[in-house]
Design a protein with these regions (language model features):
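Short, Lys/Arg-enriched N-terminal segments with co-localized hydrophobic residues
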Residues: 1-6
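A residue-level marker of the well-folded mature domains of exported/periplasmic proteins
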Residues: 186, 193-198, 213
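Bacterial N-terminal signal peptides that target proteins for export
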Residues: 7-17
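Short, glycine-/small- and polar/acidic-enriched structural segments
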Residues: 35-179, 183-188, 202-209
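Bacterial N-terminal signal peptides
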Residues: 16-29
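N-terminal compositionally biased, intrinsically disordered segments and leader/signal-like regions
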Residues: 7-8, 29-31
């Protein structure tokens, strides 16, 4: 799945402008060209594109462009969208499903695609799960584990309305099932990880960085 990220275009006349500002400072003092920074509240998940924005802020590149970046952390893209009004963020980076559902309802605009992180989404089950006993039930998807008999009635922990939720739905479709054939428990990633580690659920669907744990 994909995520948005901000891309910065540099002015080819930046050096000339810098020289102009230095001259202005020499002539009339620093107060003549110093402008208050524009606050920019943004929302992010613990993913790759967030590091890029964090690094830019650490280096002071936001202030160099007249911005004062604020990074709000969230556990899922659905939470980012749900709290859009209360958090009052202007720009965010989320997965495909939250972005698409929000844009279709005219709640936001998609301004760019950052990268393809579909490989970071995964469904995990325990080593002794019957789901792992069959592979290739659907001849069109020979590498996919599970069959209707081993999956029907099982409990899956997943943050609803996310890319992982969509992936789970598509996996069920490959096996000839749908969400009504299983039990879905809605939990945010950190809570879901703890619950699964404590023995709850038969499988869990998440994305990076949880999938690396």
């Amino acid at each position: 799945w994909v995520d948005e990220e901000i891309m910065k275009v540099r002015n080819p006349f930046a050096g000339l402008l810098a020289l102009f500002f230095v001259v202005a400072w020499c002539l009339s003092g620093s107060a003549a060209f110093a402008k208050p920074l524009v606050p920019l509240r943004t929302a992010w998940l613990g993913e790759h594109e967030t590091f890029l924005v964090w690094y830019a802020r650490e280096k002071g590149w936001d202030k160099a462009e007249g911005l004062d970046l604020e990074l709000l952390p969230f556990e899922s893209g659905k939470n980012v969208i749900d709290e859009m009004q209360s958090s009052n963020w202007a720009i965010a980076g989320v997965g495909a499903m939250p972005a698409l559902t929000a844009s279709l309802s005219s709640r936001l605009y998609i301004v760019g695609i950052g990268n393809d992180e579909s490989a970071s989404n995964a469904i995990f089950t325990r080593a002794d799960s019957p789901i792992l006993k069959m592979k290739g039930f659907n001849p069109n998807c020979p590498e996919v584990y599970g069959n209707p008999g081993s999956v029907r009635g099982k409990t899956f922990i997943v943050p609803k309305g996310t890319s992982a939720h969509y992936m789970l739905s598509r996996w069920l479709h490959v096996l000839g099932l749908n969400e009504r054939d299983v039990n879905i428990v809605d939990m945010q990633p950190s809570e879901a990880m703890k619950a699964f580690a404590d023995g709850q659920g038969d499988a869990i669907a998440l994305w990076a960085p949880q999938t690396f744990e």
